[in-house]
């Protein structure tokens, strides 16, 4: 499954439509955390982060960890400066009103797997 398919299957709102998505690159891993040092230590490159954190550091961590996308759950939406930085870094941002637990469960059903700490 690629990012486009993931977004469609989960009904996610794409906050960064101007970021080009490589539809040939599969997304295999997910990570859920609001502790960004934990994300840096354990999230796998090319994976997807599910979080309620919406500040600028989330994009910096996603870029440093080479994540494919960030999903903001529980109705959280970042400010425009965060969205602009994600576009600059080439990070896809999604948003959903679904709680993080439900998002992670759906990603697991779709075949994504987590990272062992």
Task: Enumerate the predicted regions with their spans.
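N-terminal, charge-rich interaction modules
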Residues: 1-20
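Glycine/Thr-rich beta-alpha phosphate-binding loop at enzyme active sites
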Residues: 25
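Feature captures the catalytic cores and cofactor-binding loops of soluble hydro-lyases/lyases
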Residues: 22, 31-48, 52-117
